[in-house]
């Protein structure tokens, strides 16, 4: 008797978005390989996959580090469609990159058409607090307006690097559980309706 193939670990798809030079790649590489790579700006999107243990369960995280082609709307929209959760990164030392998060958020909501998509606002380079250009209160206010978590990270010192990826994976997992319950509830309703129709006949 052949055994049913066992399902592999759950896969969570994360998309990194943000202006150039804010440290999206540095955060990704620090999380993937425990290495700080300064001034790494890829010219094309890079995809990374890693097995991790999330709250005692082995899962896979798939990270798409967007770059360069974000200027091409069709390519950018395809990336956004494939994502289950988003880390929207800016540098606390660069106000322009903070202002740009508004546009990234709007683009994602337009493509996903879903206000409650798993999403974290990430202020990177918190090791350079003496060069801070974006007040903490302003960052927290924006996150509050969007109803999303706000976390400050440093790809250099590794501060909160694991936290943002794991927190986002938890949000994605929670969302999948809710969606699965909703789908199963709708299927049960359809079955009930079919049974009622049979009874009426």
Curated annotation (Swiss-Prot):
EC number of this enzyme: 3.6.5.2
Propiece span(s): 199-201
GO molecular function, one term: PDZ domain binding
GO cellular component: cleavage furrow; Flemming body; plasma membrane
Lipid anchor positions (S-geranylgeranyl cysteine): 198
Location within or outside the cell: Cell membrane; Cleavage furrow; Midbody, Midbody ring
UniProt-annotated binding residues for GTP: 18-25, 65-69, 124-127
SMART domains in the record: RAB, RAN, RAS, RHO
CDD domains tied to this protein: RalA_RalB
Protein name: Ras-related protein Ral-a
Organism the protein comes from: Drosophila melanogaster (Fruit fly)
